[in-house]
Each structure stands twice: as C-alpha cells, then as structure tokens.
Amino acid sequence: MKKMNLLVMSLVSAAALSFTSCSDSEDLANDNAGQAKADGFYMTLTVQSPNASGTRTSVLDPTEFATADEAAIKKGTLYLVDANGKIAFSENLSNLDWKGQTDKNESSKKDGNKTFKIEVKDVHAGNTYKVYFKAGDQLPTAEMNFKPTLSNIFATDKKFATPFAEAENFAMFNQNDSQVDGNGYTVTFSKANNNEANPAKVNYNGVAGSPIKVERVVARIDAPVNKSTQILASYPKNASEALKVAIDDAKEKVDNIELVDYAVANLANQSYVMQTWNNNQLSLPANTEYTQKGTEFGDKYFYKDNKFFNNEPVNYVFENNSTDNPTTMYFEYKVTLKDMANADFKEGANAGTFYRYNNVIYTSFDQIIKDYKDVPNFFGGKDAKTMKTELDNAINDDTKLSEFRKTYNIEVFKGGKTYYKHVIKDNHINGIIQRNSIYRLNINNIFNVGAQVPNGEPTENDYYYINVTVTVNPWVLNTEDVDLQ
C-alpha cells in the first residue's frame, strides 16, 4: 500500500475547465464558447496543478519539480462513465497550454481557465457519472472500457516507455492509491445545471468542485550519481575474512575507479492506464513481458554485448512489481591500478586489463605463477608466456574469453572494466517501482573491485558488490545510496 509519506506528485498540470452542453458542438478552442444558454447541461471540471510539495497529502523530502517537458499538458480526454461502466460522454481536448510548477517560482505554473461548449447527448438529470481525465494523446491497446477499468492498458514495443513520455505529451491519468480513489470523482446533473451560471461540479468525498488529481503513468530512472572514486578502507557489515583480504588488496592496488556507463534491465512492456492494486499490492496486467532482461547481459563468465549500456541522463519506464524480473541497474566502472609497469596489457585496445585470482589482483600471469609456484600442475603446468598467448587469442572474442575464465577459474577484467548491479526499489514499498516517481541511485562508497562481467557472481552475496541509496519525488524522488564492493 502506498504510504502517506511516499506520495508522488500526482498532478503535473492544471486547469479549471468548464464543460458545457448545447444543441450543437463547437470548436473547443473557441474562446467565446459557452456564452449562450443551451439545451442540455453545463459542467465544471477542475484539474488541479501541484504546488511545491506535490498534490498528494504528503511527499517525502527532498522533492523535485518536473521539467517543462514533463509538466506540460497540451492534449487530454474527458470521460463521463455511467453506473453500468458505459462511457456516456468523452471529448478530446487540444491546444491546451497548461503546465505544472517547474521551479520554486510559482509563476512557472500556468493554470488553464477556459470555458468549453460541449454537446452532451447522453447524460440525464438525476444520474451520477464517474469522471476521469487522461492527459496526453496516447491510446490504450483497445478502446477505453470502464467495465472494468482493468481492461485499459498502455503497451509499447519499444525498450523503454518513451511513447508515453513524449515532450509536452506525458500520459497521465487519475491518481489511484490509498490516498486517492481514482474511481471516486463523480458528477450528478440536475435540471438547474442547464444554465452556464449554475454548472454541475465534480464531487469527491462530498466536496463539490473537487479537482481531479492525475499522475504520470511512467516512472523515471535517472543516471546514477557517482560520489566515490576510491576503494574505501573500511569493511561492509558482516564481511568474511576472505572478503576483508580482497578489500585490503584492492585498497592497496587501485589508484582510481570511475563510473563510465550504466544500463537498466527488466523493462515492463505494459501498464494499466490507471494504477491498480490487489489486496494492497501493486498489480500489473496479465502476460506482462520484459525487454532488456537481466539474463540478456550474459552469464557469470560471459559478457553479451547487446548495446544496453546507454549513459542516458534519464530513462522512462513502466512500473514493475516482478520478483523474477525486478528493475535492475548495472554499473560499468573503469579501474586504474597504481602499478602497471610489468603488466601483460600495457598498450593497445585492451590496455589496463588485469586479473583477480583467489581474491587477489594481478597484472601479469608471471606474478600469479610465482605466488603459486609450489602448487603442482598449476594452470595445467603452463608457464606465463603460454597463458598470455592463450589469452591473447581469446580476449577479443567474448565466447572464447568466457571459456578461458571458466577453464582456469580466473577473473579477467578486460580493459580494466568492472561491473556492479543493484535492484532498484521504492523507498517504502518493497519490491516495486511505481509510476510518477523518480529513482536516482547515489554511489556513496566503493568497497572492492566488482565483477568481471555484468552478471558475474560475487563470492559473498549481492551486498558484496553494491550498497545503494534511493530517493523518490513531485515527481516523488527516491534516492538510494549505494556502496559498491
């Protein structure tokens, strides 16, 4: 269940709109619309814009304003739904110029305030209708169907949810969680509402004129923020003796470790138009599939280069609650060692390559073999020159390189690259990421050199490689501080 202090900026746009009916439809952009009394009913709808703390009851600090592209609403659709779930009336709106607050200056917010004349053939006096507002012009997989709302699904064939996060055209819909009932907005028409001076108003929890709170359908994952370029001297909690040896060795030999790229894995391909919950658990549509899956990054020895690392400033994704395919961030770092004087790879395309054997870092096979000179048949009895030649023949072919690693049980950090991964989580709801939230990972500490490939297995547990801190915002900002090992 969403908590009070987890709430996301559910509304990024704003407007006070009056919807009126008459005997003939008119252009919605007509500023003179609604001036004459007409047959039918008048109705006022308000879409509330957020203030600095968002539109929900409470938002965690720190919060973060949307960008202008994320805050603007240029298009939208109003739905009135009868007691049987039938859409009694809908109207597409365009040429809107509403926008939510984008900085501390409240003048950055522009609330819409227009009167529209709309023909309302199918609403009747005395009847109550549920009211929904969809921002953006994106369409669900089938016609909007409120019998039940669960049938309304957004889907994409792209890796990310970018079609639903277009500049000035973000898909948004009624907020629906423990704080706000997305199905709770209603309007009831009476004969008195056939006059523009007395329009029907949207009701929520008995309050007439209530604004409809909407939220973005997508979540935002920002590029990670690296705050550490050195191996930390201290040990993570509950570190084993073997891990302490590895950390001490890395601390002694690593001069610098720099974040160079990242990737996001396990991207859901669909989402409900309105956020949906089942027994207080976030629900995803049936048969949700995932692109850029974690398994597609390779295995514990093999790096499968599918060009997933993108270094984009932001990524927009659908929410996710999968335990089998959790939304995960992979980090790629470049390690620079203090002493490469006698290294096997000092020059060329693979310069900086080093090894780790039995938790100890080496720059040459000669160093390793000297340390294990008393071990019978070490490396199958092969000398350093033979091992180097064998690696030279494998290092530029990821399949051959993975076989080399596996055969000799040695970690080869090609080009000095090392990898970490971390499951992205909401600050207060375990195991999910949810819409209208920003997820930003801060790398605070690095304890050890990571894995040789993205899916390399740590010798301890996941904490052995990474510790992260997350924040969420208005957008709700989830930041997670991460320690890498």
What label would you give each PLM region?
Residues 61-143, 211, 220-224, 228-440, ...:
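Tryptophan-paired
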